[in-house]
Amino acid sequence: MAYDKFTTLTSSAVPLPIENVDTDQIIPARFLKATERKGFGDNLFRDWRYNSDNTPKERFILNNPIYSGKILVGGKNFGSGSSREHAAWAIYDYGFRCVVSSFFADIFRNNCLNIGVLPVQVSTEFLEQIFNAIYDNPTTEIEINLKTQTITLLSSGTQESFAINGYKKNNMLNGFDDIDYLQNIKSDIETFSESRPF
């Protein structure tokens, strides 16, 4: 399998209420030389996390120990900009398994789905509720249920449904990437091929 199966995730969350976060902010271009997916988490939001002398910027959210979890909650239009898949790699390598926003750039959304990070798009109103709940209590938990396609703010019980492509959903539930999926249905492909008269 390419990555762990994703069924239900219950976790606290890290709030990043900034709109139009682009892929160059997620992972600066100077860190894109590697071709493997490992190690990019160290440079996630590098220019926001660190000063020029590599000391942590105390006010940036990832450097605040009271916020942690496997869910990143971002502002509207998250993942815009260039199509670099390294942005999704950095998010996964850092430890996030889900990103919540009121809107995602299409290419970024697909890059996340391809590596096992679930992008959950919610309404603007629900996103605001999530931010407020986290600020009121940083340990508040969110439940993401991929099977039912629901996101629940456990502190209030407020719930909203989210959409996902059926093929991508099946892959995430099984921990498949595209190659894993093809290998899984190889016998079906061969049977179909053998049944063709040409």
Predicted regions and their residues:
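Cytosolic catalytic domains that perform sulfur/thiol-centered chemistry
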Residues: 1-198
